[in-house]
Amino acid sequence: MENIENIEVYPHNVEEFARYAHRGQKRKYSDLDYVTHPIEVASRVQDLYDNMNMVAAALLHDVLEDTDVTHSELRVWLHEEFRPEKAEAILLLVVELTDVYTKHNFPFLNRKQRKKLEADRLAMVSREAKQIKLIDIEHNSESILQEDPSFAKVFLEEKEYLLDAMESYMLRN
């Protein structure tokens, strides 16, 4: 019995946690609540993959990076909601999707340097994390192209390097 959790409850509880974590945040360029982004990413993940861990991670993919929720708090909550192995699998995906090379963590690096290091790091994450990241990039690209065409050029160049790094790593391994 691999999937004991009620699938109807599973993403709903995670979505509620994401809503709580992102409360008060707005999407850049719009008045939409920020949580609409991870919800859309999760919806696309669910449409493409039959993997509820990926759906949960997609809902939570920006929680550690963009909210006050700590790794420990997320781990505790996941363990309250799911069996230990499922909680850890979701947490691992969220950690893989969380930017390491941020301005806060690496203030001495410029944006281009940080994005290159982040792309190189993301090239080595799990296949599931890569699949979520690609959908995240797709959704962000749509928004940026529509709302800030001048920044879109920079954003898309950074993502092109990331996609090349991911492809290169996958071809080597």
Could you tell me what each predicted segment is?
Residues M1-N173:
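Active-site helical microenvironments for divalent-metal-assisted chemistry
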